[in-house]
Amino acid sequence: MFYFYSEGKKLRLPIKQIIYAEILNHDLYITTNGWGTVHSRMTLAAFLEKMPDNFIRIHHSYVINTDYLMGVGYRECTVAGNVVLPVARGMQKTVEKYFM
């Protein structure tokens, strides 16, 4: 379980349902399988510290759960829901490794 605060409430979220997380204007948005998107005031680095090894940072603004990795292209990847996310140049090989 992942415990976090969102809009003044302490919430818990099953880690296996997290598809990806995005940082936008210093706010963390966590997209899930079944819960929609939830919001928290947390850094992406702090979020990643609490996640298991199958979560990787693919870009300055994104962390993905590799269990939901559906496809890899040049400097982008597709996760569940056909969401296309950017991949940093230096992370391309890492993402491809998890896809294989």
What spans do the regions from the language model cover?
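Basic, polyanion-interacting recognition surfaces, primarily
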Residues: 1-100
